């Protein structure tokens, strides 16, 4: 009896952890892109440098909850809800290619293109991952690296 309870507990733990880690992907469609500034105190995101105009894709499937311009220094941005209180936000885009309410597929749907809108210095995507709706009173940002599965190549320099 004890073994079966432990087996069930282990299976539930795996079921809760794996979707967040395994089902995500590198958000910039360029093999020469890299993390130019990592998640740390004072910078609660990963900045991914890439040539202007490079496609930006979601790290995970979900539904767009915001797409457009905001005056928060993020410029053109897209926010995606992935379920279970997980959101990803992509800032400094050249423009957005999706609209609010649209379903997006991991690595397949173009959210926009890399740009330097808002207060950006140089072309990059500022990627944030949130637990809770972005900028909500009980929400907080988590390290995006924990949700990116970059495959067999590692497009980063400062990790």
Please place each PLM-identified region on the residue numbering.
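Short glycine/proline-centered loop/turn elements that form peptide/ligand docking sites
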Residues: 97-98, 110, 116-123
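Histidine-centered divalent-metal-coordination microenvironment in nucleic-acid enzymes
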Residues: 124-128
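Short histidine-centered loop motifs in beta-beta connectors
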Residues: 49-51, 57-58, 67, 84-108, ...
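Short, solvent-exposed loop/turn segments that connect beta-strands within catalytic domains
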Residues: 72, 133-139
């Amino acid at each position: 009896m004890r073994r079966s309870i432990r087996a069930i507990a282990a299976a539930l733990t795996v079921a809760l952890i794996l979707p967040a880690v395994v089902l995500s992907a590198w958000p910039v469609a360029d093999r020469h892109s890299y993390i130019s500034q990592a998640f740390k105190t004072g910078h609660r995101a990963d900045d991914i440098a890439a040539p202007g105009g490079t496609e930006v894709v979601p790290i995970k499937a979900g539904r767009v909850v915001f797409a457009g311009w905001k005056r928060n220094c993020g410029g053109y941005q897209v926010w995606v809800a992935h379920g279970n209180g997980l959101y990803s936000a992509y800032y400094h885009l050249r423009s957005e290619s999706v609209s609010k309410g649209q379903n997006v597929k991991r690595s397949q749907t173009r959210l926009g293109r890399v740009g330097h809108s808002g207060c950006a210095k140089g072309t990059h995507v500022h990627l944030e991952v949130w637990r809770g709706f972005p900028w909500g009173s009980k929400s907080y940002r988590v390290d995006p690296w924990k949700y990116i599965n970059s495959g067999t190549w590692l497009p980063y320099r400062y990790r």
